Amino acid sequence: MTSAGILLYRRIGGVVEVLLCHPGGPVWAKRDEGAWSVPKGEVAKDEDLLEVARREFHEEVGIPLSCARPLPLGSVTLRSGKVVHAWACEGDVDPADQRSNAFSMEWPPRSGRVQEFPEVDRVEWFHPEAARRKLNAAQTALVDRLLDLLEES
């Protein structure tokens, strides 16, 4: 399984912040540290990775991405075996404007009741130290790679 995503960053007074997504739905409702993610989504066969990353950012954040030159951050492998390819883009969005696509699932389990939930229930800006705590552990390397790239430029 493969996903592609965009790590949006901004600089406020010389300090870098990154935008992360919290997954929606009842399974994730009470999880915080280690539960957040880069806005990303699954890649179908023969899809362009960067195009998928841009599409998924729009679907999960609800705001089209305008980024002329995304910075490649490489890939990371999650515990599940899923490979996540990521790019960084500089930009700014207001988390209050976030609108996500939705998914349906039976909830509560074995109830026969199907409910709809947002794929992402919120997005927030984080300083790198906080982002490392919030992110799925495998994705923390993406923040480190971004900071390395920004130091080099």
Residue ranges and their predicted role:
Residues 124, 128-153:
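Charged phosphate-binding loop/patch that engages nucleotide di/tri-phosphates or the phosphate backbone
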Residues 38-73, 127:
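The catalytic Nudix box helix
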Residues 30, 46, 134:
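Residues that scaffold the ATP/ADP-binding catalytic core of kinase and kinase-like folds
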Residues 115-121:
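Non-DNA-binding regulatory cores of transcription-related proteins
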Residues 1-37, 87:
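N-terminal strand-loop-strand
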Residues 12-15, 25-28, 44-45, 80-82, ...:
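Short, charged/polar surface micro-motifs in flexible loops or helix N-caps
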Residues 35-39, 45, 89, 151:
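Functional cleft and adjacent loop/helix regions within the main domain
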Residues 75-112, 124, 146:
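Active-site-adjacent beta-strand/loop module that shapes the phosphate/pyrophosphate-binding cleft
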